[in-house]
């Protein structure tokens, strides 16, 4: 089974959590694209979706799924999204696709966060995957200096502007032994919009695509 087939297995397995008549929170990325394909088979049965990115919105609309603005809904039953890394405590690094801020907002209003990944994303300690930080452009250099003080090696993601009009710093060399503390520290730097650490709001359900199929941990 290829990596993409494992992603597909995870994405389609998440469909069991979708309730008829509900509005579904939808993330961003290659694994989520498989979930969106699956959700398309229920387009007549759900009310619609709240999307975390322009890319996912376009894909959902192409399948006839109505898009709701985040401000139109008080809460969501579920939010389905992938991760770049996930540890045993279900804390994650996300934001490789630069949609971290909107992903964090949609995750915050969801009752249940369902993380869909392939087996390569599970790690003992977060930080091998570079940690994305969304930054207001004028604060880029200042934030980078503060990230160095925290032990990181920040790298400006050239040519990338987020859906919110900001830039991304990818922080290398972080061995993240206390994700919640680091999330607070980085979010406290003036000019940071948010960091791609999902520690305070981790996953409630993890669906992992494996060569044997989807493995669900609730």
UniProtKB/Swiss-Prot annotation:
Source species: Vibrio vulnificus (strain CMCP6)
One GO term of the biological process aspect: pentose-phosphate shunt, non-oxidative branch
Catalyses which reaction(s): aldehydo-D-ribose 5-phosphate = D-ribulose 5-phosphate
Protein's job: Catalyzes the reversible conversion of ribose-5-phosphate to ribulose 5-phosphate.
Residues annotated to bind substrate: 28-31, 81-84, 94-97, 121
Keywords from the named record: Isomerase
Gene3D superfamilies: 3.30.70.260, 3.40.50.1360
Subunit comment: Homodimer.
Entry's EC annotation: 5.3.1.6
GO MF annotations in UniProt: ribose-5-phosphate isomerase activity
Pathway(s) this gene product operates in, as recorded in its UniProt entry: Carbohydrate degradation; pentose phosphate pathway; D-ribose 5-phosphate from D-ribulose 5-phosphate (non-oxidative stage): step 1/1
Name of the protein described by the UniProt record: Ribose-5-phosphate isomerase A
Cross-referenced InterPro entries: NagB/RpiA_transferase-like (IPR037171), Ribose5P_isomerase_typA_subgr (IPR020672), Ribose5P_isomerase_type_A (IPR004788)
Residues the record marks as active site: 103 (proton acceptor)
Cellular component GO terms, alphabetical: cytosol
Family, as annotated: Belongs to the ribose 5-phosphate isomerase family.
């Amino acid at each position: 089974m290829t990596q993409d087939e494992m992603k597909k297995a995870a994405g389609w397995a998440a469909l069991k959590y979708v309730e008829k008549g509900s509005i579904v929170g939808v993330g961003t990325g290659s694994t989520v694209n498989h979930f969106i394909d699956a959700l398309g088979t229920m387009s007549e049965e759900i009310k619609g979706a709240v999307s975390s990115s322009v890319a996912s919105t376009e894909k959902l609309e192409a399948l006839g799924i109505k898009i709701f603005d985040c401000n139109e809904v008080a809460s969501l039953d579920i939010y389905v999204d992938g991760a770049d890394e996930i540890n045993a405590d279900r804390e994650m690094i996300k934001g490789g696709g630069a949609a971290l801020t909107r992903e964090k907002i949609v995750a915050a209003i969801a009752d249940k966060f369902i993380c869909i990944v392939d087996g390569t994303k599970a790690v003992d300690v977060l930080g091998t995957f570079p940690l994305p930080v969304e930054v207001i452009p004028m604060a880029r250099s200042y934030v980078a200096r503060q990230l160095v003080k925290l032990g990181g090696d920040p790298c400006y993601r050239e040519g990338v502007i987020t859906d919110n009009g900001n830039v991304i710093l990818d922080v290398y060399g972080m061995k993240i032994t206390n994700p919640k503390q680091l999330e607070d520290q980085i979010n406290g730097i003036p000019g940071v919009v948010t960091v791609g650490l999902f520690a305070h709001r981790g996953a409630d359900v993890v669906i992992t695509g494996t060569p044997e199929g989807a493995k669900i941990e609730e």
